[in-house]
């Protein structure tokens, strides 16, 4: 293999999955990828499974912590920077690419001190704290959504790296003569409100308008959600997880889900209209901002959880399911917003910076 690249991403799948997509692209171009993470994040499972060397530093978030933790914070951060600096010295990367999470701050500072160029990628419409703080140190800042960062020569709007199979042409059946297909992605984080809301809402639809339902309820939520559908007199296929998301997106005509950065990007990639119910307690309310992007362009409807009851959701479902041409228009708009070259673009930017 060729030169080394260091990727920094940790904590949640929202940071790690797009980073893994870029890791594969680097490997396809002959680079060796190393990963900087923390001991408690999802990267500890996903990165070794991908066959990538994982280097760990000890750092946690500071928001909402007590006074003692805040007093210790400078020493914790200094130690984390020192640990990251040792990794960089050992790996000797030509560039460092950060996707957010607690690891990104100390790792980015260590890279800058070592004279290694730093590139930042922000997945959400609102930049996370670590990425915001790294902007002055970064050679380039990549954003998934337009205008996440202030205008500068460093900024590039790239989109989010997502799984390539979602961009394959999907031959959906025409809605005429069949029931619509409704995909519900409850997930695991904040799943219960959607799992409770959907059976009640669909039960209020006229029988002739009720769609076929495929509902991902999340681990340990599937049985109670299936019971809710049965008690409401609604047929539904309820599963804890969906292993083949590309197939599920290809089946669907409409999606009801949260508005995480990757979900929003995948909806665009799959060309799917959606009803988005942002997680209300997400940091910086970034899910609402993500949803506003698709809704503002006409590819989705934004339904705030606090003000959306079963009757409200039923009314919106009725509105869109009775207008197949509107669903088609929303789907076309979603496809237009997709950025199928996001992974290649981010890697191109990194290598341009690394090699001049």
Swiss-Prot record:
One cellular component (GO) term of this entry: plasma membrane
Pfam families the UniProt entry points to: Glyco_tran_28_C, Glyco_transf_28
Binding site residues for UDP-N-acetyl-alpha-D-glucosamine: 12-14, 124, 163, 188, 242, 261-266, 287
The keyword Protease is annotated on this UniProt entry: no
Taxonomic superkingdom: Bacteria
Top class in the EC scheme: transferase
GO BP annotation list: carbohydrate metabolic process; cell division; cell wall organization; lipid glycosylation; peptidoglycan biosynthetic process; regulation of cell shape
SUPFAM superfamilies tied to this protein: UDP-Glycosyltransferase/glycogen phosphorylase
Reactions the enzyme catalyzes: di-trans,octa-cis-undecaprenyl diphospho-N-acetyl-alpha-D-muramoyl-L-alanyl-D-glutamyl-meso-2,6-diaminopimeloyl-D-alanyl-D-alanine + UDP-N-acetyl-alpha-D-glucosamine = di-trans,octa-cis-undecaprenyl diphospho-[N-acetyl-alpha-D-glucosaminyl-(1->4)]-N-acetyl-alpha-D-muramoyl-L-alanyl-D-glutamyl-meso-2,6-diaminopimeloyl-D-alanyl-D-alanine + UDP + H(+)
InterPro entries according to UniProt: GlcNAc_MurG, Glyco_trans_28_C, GlycoTrans_28_N
Keyword hit for Aminoacyl-tRNA synthetase: no
Pathway(s) the chain acts in: Cell wall biogenesis; peptidoglycan biosynthesis
Keywords noted in UniProt: Cell cycle, Cell division, Cell inner membrane, Cell membrane, Cell shape, Cell wall biogenesis/degradation, Glycosyltransferase, Membrane, Peptidoglycan synthesis, Transferase
Localization, UniProt: Cell inner membrane
Bilayer topology annotation: Peripheral membrane protein
EC annotation from Swiss-Prot or TrEMBL: 2.4.1.227
GO molecular function, one term: undecaprenyldiphospho-muramoylpentapeptide beta-N-acetylglucosaminyltransferase activity
Main location per the UniProt record: membrane
UniProt-listed PANTHER family: GLYCOSYLTRANSFERASE, UDP-N-ACETYLGLUCOSAMINE--N-ACETYLMURAMYL-(PENTAPEPTIDE) PYROPHOSPHORYL-UNDECAPRENOL N-ACETYLGLUCOSAMINE TRANSFERASE 1
Record-linked HAMAP family: MurG
Job of this protein: Cell wall formation. Catalyzes the transfer of a GlcNAc subunit on undecaprenyl-pyrophosphoryl-MurNAc-pentapeptide (lipid intermediate I) to form undecaprenyl-pyrophosphoryl-MurNAc-(pentapeptide)GlcNAc (lipid intermediate II).
Family as reported in the entry's similarity comment: Belongs to the glycosyltransferase 28 family. MurG subfamily.
Protein name in UniProt: UDP-N-acetylglucosamine--N-acetylmuramyl-(pentapeptide) pyrophosphoryl-undecaprenol N-acetylglucosamine transferase
Organism taxonomic ancestry: Bacteria, Pseudomonadati, Pseudomonadota, Gammaproteobacteria, Pseudomonadales
